[in-house]
Amino acid sequence: MSFFRCIGRFALFMLDPEHAHRLAIVGLKSGLNSYRKVVDRRLCLTVAGLEFENFVGLAAGFDKNAEVVEAIFHLGFGFTEIGTVTPKPQVGNPKPRLFRLREDEAIINRMGFNNNGHHIVYSRLCACKKLGIVGINIGANKDTVDKIDDYATGIACFYDIADYFTVNISSPNTPGLRDLQARDSLHLLMNALSQARREQKKKHGFSVPIFLKIAPDLSEKELDDVAEEMKLSDFDGLIVSNTTLSRQGLRDSKLSGEKGGLSGCPLFERSTIVLAKMRQKLGKEIAIIGVGGIKDAQTALEKIKAGADLIQLYSGIVYEGPDLAITILKEILQFMQQDGVDTIKTYRDHRVEYWAKRALPL
């Protein structure tokens, strides 16, 4: 058992979750973590035209405001995602808004896109030393009437420094945001953002990949609609998935009634089923990043086998500690050695059918 699981987690869990998160950011900014990474050509891959040193990324939500971009790569991650960032700064929803469900190794959040806004985050990113792939997760302000315009503004603002964009229309904590996943709205959104990218490509001379991040609570018909719009668009990939509104199977009855999106271990099955279904619907060429419930090498590898090209995690480091990316990569290399596999890409899609045939959880 790691030092974090023995002592560090106990100490941090004595604190309010937001306070603990702030302390983690301060620690990383102070350089308390040593520089470590796992370098092995078998972990390298190219996705959406981008070259990744490894397939394990830190999901949006941890470093919302680009405060510790360099330090995240010191933890072994192959890429990181900043945000969600909105055009104007906003404080988010009232506190308390972040809850640990320890029995379930889960988190409920209703943060509400609290962030410093485009201008400040852009300035911080410009000052960073680039150590790997950095994506920008863009969103809309809570009080915005034209939410699509907020996303287009995000693409224009960060275009010259983003390695990729994530269009976050699946957070359950901004009123009306998930409505953008409905087919007619999604069609308008994707067309507008494709046009925004074309304008920026003409200006800058290069194209930045765009990923769409979806909820795990969509019906089979809604997944079909997303797949069809993805095929019609020039978006580069999908991120599956955001947090869930479901509370199915939770043991922590005290906190399970809190409003917000649920992440962590209980999300693994639901998000992996959706991932595999979307891989079947989209075919082999469109990139997919798998997120939800990854806590070790086994769950990371299962996402790849279910159809993911890359994975992201966040809740996992809350419960397993900051060494999680390094641990996953080392153990994956052991699996590859045992299986005689030369590249992580070999595992992709091995269990798509197994996961895709399962019914979507209620």
Swiss-Prot record:
One of its GO terms (molecular function) is dihydroorotate dehydrogenase (quinone) activity. Gene3D superfamilies: Aldolase class I. It is a peripheral membrane protein. Its main location: membrane. It holds the Pfam family DHO_dh. Monomer. This is Dihydroorotate dehydrogenase (quinone). The gene is pyrD.
